[in-house]
């Protein structure tokens, strides 16, 4: 797949692997929609049946208004569109953007709102509303959950999440994303303090236990 990383994010996740994309006025270069379309079309022969273009970031919906025309052009070109989003931004542009997408990767950082705020500095209320909109509008999506010890690895929260989403028909799969520190060098380069330096990586036992928890509520669960 062709992956486009976009500048700007509304969340402040403590484990963010791309801190350089948070600031809307970051150092990324401005790219014309036509240029991205050209790249996608040129790579289309290599996409096969499962390929396409994925928009990540940062937070893609942060630039929803500018992306809508590009999404329309990509649809006309027959290119599969995937959006990786935290679901925390909502307006008419975001609504149209997600309507045009073929698949949404919805990152639910934590189900407990207070713990979500501790992890991201934002509420998860809109994320849950976005999930409900995807379900109501029959938009396929993957639910993704980063497993962070002391922050998002609580049995009661995962069970509450499962109870909330267990009857959603549009969730094609659940992905458990192990916590990693691959972006720490970026914090060092940007002279920023990485606040989770004392948090340990997940053990295989923890990942297996989390997978079993999610499988109580969802048919298809992967650890990625």
Name what the model sees in each region.
Residues 163-166, 172, 188-213:
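A structural motif corresponding to the C-terminal lobe/cap of the Radical SAM core domain
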Residues 140, 205-224:
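C-terminal accessory region of radical SAM enzymes
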Residues 20-26, 117-123, 191-199:
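Short glycine-enriched, charge-decorated loop/helix-capping segments at active-site entrances
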Residues 19-53:
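Conserved alpha-helical substructure of the radical SAM core
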Residues 41-45, 49-52, 57, 61-182, ...:
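Conserved AdoMet/S-adenosylmethionine-binding subsite of the radical SAM
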Residues 1-31:
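Canonical Radical SAM [4Fe-4S] cluster-binding loop centered on the CxxxCxxC motif
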């Amino acid at each position: 797949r062709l992956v486009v990383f976009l500048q700007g994010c509304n969340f402040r996740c403590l484990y963010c692997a791309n801190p350089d994309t948070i600031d809307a006025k970051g150092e990324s270069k401005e790219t014309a929609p036509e240029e991205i379309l050209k790249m996608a079309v040129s790579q289309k022969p290599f996409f096969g049946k499962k390929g396409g273009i994925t928009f990540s970031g940062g937070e893609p919906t942060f630039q929803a208004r500018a992306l809508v025309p590009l999404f329309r052009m990509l649809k006309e070109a027959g290119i599969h569109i995937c959006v990786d989003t935290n679901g925390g931004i909502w307006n008419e542009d975001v609504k149209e953007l997600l309507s045009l997408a073929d698949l949404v990767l919805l990152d639910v950082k934590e189900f407990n709102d207070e713990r979500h705020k501790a992890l991201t500095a934002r509420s998860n209320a809109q994320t849950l509303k976005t999930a409900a909109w995807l379900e109501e509008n029959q938009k396929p999506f993957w639910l993704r959950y980063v497993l962070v010890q002391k922050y998002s690895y609580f049995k009661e929260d995962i069970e509450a999440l499962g109870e909330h989403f267990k009857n959603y028909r549009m969730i094609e799969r659940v992905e458990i994303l192990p916590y990693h520190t691959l972006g720490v060098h970026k914090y060092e380069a940007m002279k920023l303090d990485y606040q989770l330096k004392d948090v340990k990586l997940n053990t295989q036992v923890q990942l297996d236990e989390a997978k079993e928890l999610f499988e109580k509520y969802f048919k298809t669960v992967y650890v990625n």
